[in-house]
Design a protein with these regions (language model features):
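Transmembrane beta-barrel wall of Gram-negative outer-membrane proteins
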Residues: 24, 236-269, 273-312, 344-363, ...
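Extracytoplasmic beta-strand/coil segments of soluble accessory domains associated
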Residues: 132-173
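Short acidic/polar hinge/loop motifs at secondary-structure boundaries
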Residues: 134-135, 141-145, 172-203, 220-222, ...
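Acidic/polar loop-and-plug regions of large Gram-negative outer-membrane beta-barrel proteins
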Residues: 297-355, 378-459, 523-547, 721-724
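Membrane-embedded beta-barrel scaffold of Gram-negative outer-membrane proteins
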Residues: 365-369, 656, 660, 670, ...
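Structural signature of Gram-negative outer-membrane beta-barrels, strongest in the C-terminal barrel
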Residues: 465-467, 477-485, 489-500, 505-506, ...
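C-terminal beta-signal and adjacent terminal beta-strands/loops
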Residues: 715-717, 862-884, 913-980
Length: 980
């Protein structure tokens, strides 16, 4: 009997023990986008810093750990060519935890090059400052090729501008508060620290915000997310900079919960293609984190990328042809025999971030982040007063200014044209100062001027941001089928915009007066003052010394708050989500100096009078025009909503439909008529309304991948503001357009197929779109010196221009057909397109990877249907009607037409290898060759000048030549790295 009881007790103990170890963890490891399974990944099970078990994923990406006691575990997932990840899992009540999917992102060969290099164009005053909008790829078959491979051509995803792509850092929205642009340059050179990121494409939502219609990217940047270990690399890129040195270290999360990381780099030297362009940039990241327990984690990190960089300028084709080089750069010249660039960007914008993460259970997690951005961003440019234009490619220095074969241009001085052409085409030191900036002459002019008052100077246009941000979000798994995500973010931005005297170029001082105003109001000394208060107090214009502010000085004040939520329901392969945002945007201008032209009222509310003349002025609606003090506050209610449906079938098939509507506030820089000079807002400012949808099919199985997407986006009520010299008015003017509408529709196709040789795959992508303007916006043109409205009408040929029926051609001149009433017969309309991106792009790529870590890649690309950026002046009745105001078919077809760039074909290749030493050290290299056919005639962008040439008979206008940017010829990037 006693033996029987002992056996029974032992049996019950064994059963109890077995029931305590019935728990487990299972999941499938998949590529983050496309959900392709990752076979052969190493999964490690860790508890309290001790490695318990390991598993290798099956061909379908699955793994399983069985017989686990209740408790909290860490799962670490690593795979070749992927960025590893670690997640926390709790096993309780003896149940098998099914995590469904563990997602990891692929490491690209090209990740060692800075995406920001393609985003910083230094073209703010040319109207061409959009960055590529797909540099952060999500690694499906389409974006894997397009995301990096199309960077050289400055491809815009679906034709969208940079500001439509939402970029987050540690969960904080980082798009620029003033312009909305993506802020790539803020972390340029910190590849390792910023490598860990989550991205969505198009209308997909994320864990950090609802986002817009051009994807969301969140860069983790916390120290525990930086790749563990040491890494050193040296890189040379012939198209960007001569040398990049980089080092990084990350401890990972230690047993005591602490984590440390740093990343530093230097980018130095010029490149093989553009003279005067150089880098002298440095970058430093440092971070520390502490996990106090399984619920609480705190991370603190800071980084900055101080440096300077010489910039390139666009020029006309005439100049490029005279120099025999499409890479000619008019920004530089020789000073004492050394190259000096007049356009140099200086940056130092440190960022400090504190992030708190709270994970009380597997079903709920949340974070809160505080981020501060400070420092300065500026670029230099030549300034001059009472002197000749010092730019070498100024139109009066070119042969075409003196002579053109067409007599109607009234340029008939052949002798001067011949001399100018000779001076431009000689390649001897004697003519270098004609083809480039003559720095020595500028110094001599200043030195010999009375009192050494500088006629020439080097200004620095500064943008100093003080940007305080807060963001918080949560993720709650309410039931196994329903997840709720939500959060809030807020921003307080104070940005000072001003000019700084960078270099007096040998002079003693520079007068702080408005040279454009002096030409029109020379008899009234007060009106020409940039700082009227100084003039009234001292009786003369301020003498500006080096390092002093001058010209303009104002604050852009932005306040922003946003709430968002996203509900996701999943069942049996079907997923539905509904997301929305609600926010408030407010901004105003605060002038810090009083400009003579727009004196406003004094501190007592009275008009300002000088020597019997009233300086206070009023706009066309009777409102006082002020330059100093606070402007009217613009406040907008913003909101958006998204709906997403997806169905995943067995065998790797996935169908999805996304739709969204967005009501966004206009940006600060497109809301003021002339923020440099006055507080006047654009009339009838409205929110931008966008309706967008896409339909997707994806297939991933057995190494085969396919993605097909059709998309549509309609954008309404955009605003654009620009300033330019109007020849018809002989004055500097401001041009404000409202009601700009666009339509983007297109097709994306990506396919990857494994070939007959193991490790060899073929990939092909197609991007076809039609990105067109769909409205003729309203425009108001004002004189910059007086705010006088000189034109308020629609821009009749903005969205398209007519093509007229030709009756005959006589001596090479078209004779247009007319109807019975004498009206010219229109045969059709030619659409006008979104600029500076190919609307047809294709690529074919072969990739070969060996088991001993060699890789080879060869790709061919074709781009077409890219268009020049238009200016509105050429699409007005004024420009098309000429001096006599009569529009003829030939004038309209000539003046309103939009230039289409020639197609381009490129061939690229890369090779690389890595070696492992004692399973501890890795050394490797990658060599990439771009544009191997050395095609030097590929236009990547440009813009129309806003100048007009009056004909000999004063009855019509001709255009100034447009200015272009070209892609560099054959170039290489060599990267050598060592890590352990």
């Amino acid at each position: 009997m006693k033996r029987t009881l002992l056996i029974l007790a032992a049996f019950l103990t064994l059963c109890a023990s077995a029931s305590a170890y019935d728990g487990g963890i299972k999941a499938s490891v998949v590529n983050r986008t496309g959900r392709a399974p990752v076979a052969g990944a190493l999964v490690s099970l860790i508890q309290d810093g001790e490695l318990l078990r390991t598993a290798t994923t099956a061909p379908d990406g699955s793994f399983c750990f069985e017989d686990l006691p209740d408790g909290k575990y860490n799962l670490s997932v690593e795979a070749s060519d992927f960025i590893g990840t670690t997640i926390n899992v709790t096993v309780e009540k003896g149940l098998m935890r099914d995590l469904m999917f563990v997602t990891i992102s692929r490491v690209r060969v090209g990740e060692d090059i800075d995406a920001s290099n393609f985003a910083e164009f230094d073209l703010e005053d040319s109207g061409y400052s959009d960055a590529p909008t797909i540099l952060f790829s999500t690694n499906d078959v389409y974006t894997d090729v397009v995301g990096y491979g199309f960077s050289n051509i400055r491809f815009k995803n679906r034709g969208y501008n940079s500001e439509t792509q939402d970029v987050y850092l540690a969960g904080v929205p980082m798009n620029d508060a003033i312009t909305g642009y993506s802020p790539f340059s803020l972390w340029s050179g910190l590849n390792e620290a910023m490598r860990a990121k989550d991205s969505t494409l198009g209308l997909e939502s994320s864990d950090f915000g609802v986002g817009g219609y051009n994807g969301v990217t969140n860069i983790s940047a916390i120290p525990s997310a930086v790749r563990t270990g040491w890494r050193f690399s040296i890189l040379s890129n012939s198209a960007l900079y001569r040398l990049r040195l980089m080092a990084s270290y990350s401890s990972g999360e230690l047993d005591n919960g602490w984590s440390y990381a740093f990343n530093a780099s230097a980018r130095l030297g010029g490149n093989d293609w553009v003279e005067g362009v150089y880098y002298r940039n440095f970058a430093l990241y440092a971070g520390v984190g502490k996990r106090f327990n399984d619920e609480h984690k705190l991370s603190l990190f800071a980084f900055a990328t101080p440096g300077q960089r010489g910039a390139q300028n666009a020029s006309t084709q005439e100049v490029y042809d005279l120099m025999g080089d499409n890479m000619y750069n008019s920004n530089w010249g020789y000073q004492n025999g050394k190259v000096r660039n007049s356009r140099v960007r200086h940056t130092f914008e440190p960022i400090v971030t504190l992030k708190y993460e709270y994970t009380p259970s597997d079903e709920f997690n949340a974070y809160a982040t505080v981020l501060f951005r400070g420092g300065y961003n500026g670029y230099t440019a030549l300034d001059w007063y009472d002197a000749q234009d010092p730019r070498p490619d100024y139109y009066r220095n070119l042969p075409s200014y003196f002579y053109m074969e067409e007599d109607d241009y009234n340029r008939v001085n052949f002798e001067k044209a011949a001399w100018a052409e000779y001076a431009w085409t000689q390649r001897t030191p004697a003519y270098a100062n004609y083809q480039h900036i003559n720095w020595d002459r500028l110094y001599n002019v200043n030195y010999n001027n009375p009192e050494r008052r500088s006629k020439y100077a080097l200004e620095e246009r500064r943008v100093d941001q003080r940007d305080l941000n807060f963001a918080a979000a949560f993720n709650y798994l309410a039931t196994p089928r329903f997840t709720l995500k939500g959060g809030l973010d807020a921003k307080i931005n104070r940005t000072e915009n001003y000019k700084l005297m960078n270099d007096l170029l040998g002079g003693n001082y520079y007068l702080n007066i408005d040279s454009f105003a002096e030409r029109d109001f020379a008899s009234n000394e007060a009106l020409v003052q940039n700082d009227l208060d100084y003039f009234l107090a001292n009786g003369s214009a301020e003498k500006i010394m080096q390092g002093r502010k001058y010209g303009y000085d104002y604050l852009a004040q932005i306040r922003r708050a946003n709430l968002w939520a996203n509900g996701i329901y999943s069942k049996d392969g079907f997923t539905a989500s509904l997301a929305g945002t609600l926010g408030v945007d407010s901004f105003w201008r605060e002038g810090l100096v009083r400009k003579g032209l727009f004196a406003g009222l004094d501190d007592n509310g009275n008009e300002i009078v000088y020597e019997g003349r009233t300086l206070t002025s009023y706009d066309h609606k009777g409102r006082v025009i002020t330059s100093k003090g606070k402007s009217e506050v613009s406040t907008f209610l913003t909101w958006s909503t998204k709906l997403a449906l997806a169905y995943e079938m067995t065998g790797g098939h996935r169908f999805s439909v996304n739709a969204g509507y967005f009501n966004d506030a206009p940006t600060f820089n497109q809301s003021f008529i002339s923020a440099r000079t006055r507080n006047s807002l654009v009339d009838n400012l409205q929110t931008v309304k966008t309706l967008s949808a896409d339909v997707n099919y994806q297939y991933n199985n057995n190494g085969y991948s396919l993605r097909v997407t059709g998309f549509y986006t309609g954008i309404k009520d955009q605003t654009d503001v620009m300033s330019f010299y109007d020849d018809s008015q002989q004055s500097f003017t401001n041009f404000a357009m409202t009601g700009i509408d666009q339509r983007h529709l297109g097709l994306e196709l990506g396919v990857k197929v494994p070939l007959f040789v193991q490790g060899l795959t073929a990939s092909a992508v197609l991007s076809w779109g039609e990105y067109v303007y769909t409205s003729n916006p309203e425009m108001v043109q004002t004189v910059d010196n007086s705010a006088e409205v000189i034109r308020s009408e629609s821009v009749p040929y903005w969205k398209s221009h007519p093509v007229y029926k030709v009756a005959a051609v006589v001596d090479g001149v078209k004779v247009y057909d007319q109807d019975a009433d004498g009206n010219y017969i229109v045969e059709g309309e030619v659409k006008h397109y979104g600029p500076s991106t190919p609307q047809l792009a294709t690529a074919f790529q072969l990739n070969y990877r060996t088991n001993d870590y060699w890789f080879f890649e060869l790709g061919a690309q074709f781009f077409a249907n890219s268009y020049l950026d238009m200016n509105p002046l050429y699409r007005t009745h004024l420009a098309c009607g000429g001096g006599d105001g009569i529009e003829t078919p030939s004038e309209v077809e000539y003046m309103a037409a939009q230039e289409k760039f020639d197609p381009a074909f490129l061939l690229n290749g890369s090779i690389g290898k890595s070696w492992q030493i004692n399973r501890t050290y890795t050394i490797g290299f990658s060599l990439e060759a771009s544009n191997m056919l050395n095609n030097r005639n590929v236009k990547t962008g440009g813009y129309e000048q806003t100048r007009l040439i009056s004909s000999y008979g004063k009855d019509r206008y001709y255009r100034f030549d447009p200015k272009y940017f070209y892609m560099s010829g054959a170039s290489y990037m060599l990267n050598i790295y060592f890590r352990f």
